[in-house]
């Protein structure tokens, strides 16, 4: 009788310990989200900047805006602002000769990751460069920004 109660007590204690134990530090979690964002951006860039992409010249006519200075997580608001335009460009250029697999999923993943990193509030006002960028320049710049933030975190 007592052994059953003791076993239940031990099981409940273990459940409480497991559920209350932190899985990772906030800094580690932030770094993991940044690395996922970086990976998603790199996959999109590889899909677009591909020698088989016959639609690339058309894609380069669309212009995107980059932040003047992006060094912190709050600057990811500027990326989020341009995701709709990026999605439209990717949707327009889908064809039999060029199909970026799961472009919509990558954009959704990027959007979710950005919200996790910067928070859901949109109080930050982006200051954009005067010169617009092509889709390739846009993705390369955001890749560099993510790499810079990650390297700052690991120092």
Swiss-Prot record:
Gene3D superfamilies: 1.20.1250.10. It is found in: Secreted. GO terms for molecular function: carbohydrate binding; cytokine activity; glycosphingolipid binding; growth factor activity; interleukin-2 receptor binding; kappa-type opioid receptor binding. Its main location: secreted. GO terms for biological process: activated T cell proliferation; adaptive immune response; cell surface receptor signaling pathway via STAT; extrinsic apoptotic signaling pathway in absence of ligand; G protein-coupled receptor signaling pathway; gene expression; interleukin-2-mediated signaling pathway; leukocyte activation involved in immune response. Keywords: Adaptive immunity, Cytokine, Disulfide bond, Glycoprotein, Growth factor, Immunity, Secreted, Signal. It comes from the Eukaryota. InterPro entries: 4_helix_cytokine-like_core, IL-2, IL-2_CS. Disulfide bonds join 78-126. Pfam families: IL2. Residues 1-20 form the signal peptide. Glycans are attached at residue 23. One of its GO terms (cellular component) is extracellular space. The keyword Glycoprotein applies. The keyword Signal applies. Coiled coil: none annotated. Transmembrane segments: none annotated. SUPFAM superfamilies: 4-helical cytokines. Cytokine produced by activated CD4-positive helper T-cells and to a lesser extend activated CD8-positive T-cells and natural killer (NK) cells that plays pivotal roles in the immune response and tolerance. Binds to a receptor complex composed of either the high-affinity trimeric IL-2R (IL2RA/CD25, IL2RB/CD122 and IL2RG/CD132) or the low-affinity dimeric IL-2R (IL2RB and IL2RG). Interaction with the receptor leads to oligomerization and conformation changes in the IL-2R subunits resulting in downstream signaling starting with phosphorylation of JAK1 and JAK3. Belongs to the IL-2 family. This is Interleukin-2. It comes from Rattus norvegicus (Rat).
């Amino acid at each position: 009788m007592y052994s059953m109660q003791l076993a239940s007590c031990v099981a409940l204690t273990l459940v409480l310990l497991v559920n209350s134990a932190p899985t990772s530090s906030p800094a580690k979690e932030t770094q993991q989200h940044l690395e996922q964002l970086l990976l998603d951006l790199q996959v999109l860039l590889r899909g677009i900047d591909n020698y088989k992409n016959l639609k690339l010249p058309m894609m380069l006519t669309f212009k995107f805006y980059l932040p003047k200075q992006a060094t912190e997580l709050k600057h990811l608001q500027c990326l989020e602002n341009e995701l709709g335009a990026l999605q439209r460009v990717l949707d327009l250029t889908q064809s039999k000769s060029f199909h970026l697999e799961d472009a919509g999923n990558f954009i959704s993943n990027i959007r979710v990751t950005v919200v996790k990193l910067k928070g859901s509030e949109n109080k930050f006002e982006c200051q954009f460069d005067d010169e617009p960028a092509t889709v390739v320049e846009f993705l390369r710049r955001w890749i560099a920004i993510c790499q810079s933030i990650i390297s700052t975190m690991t120092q």
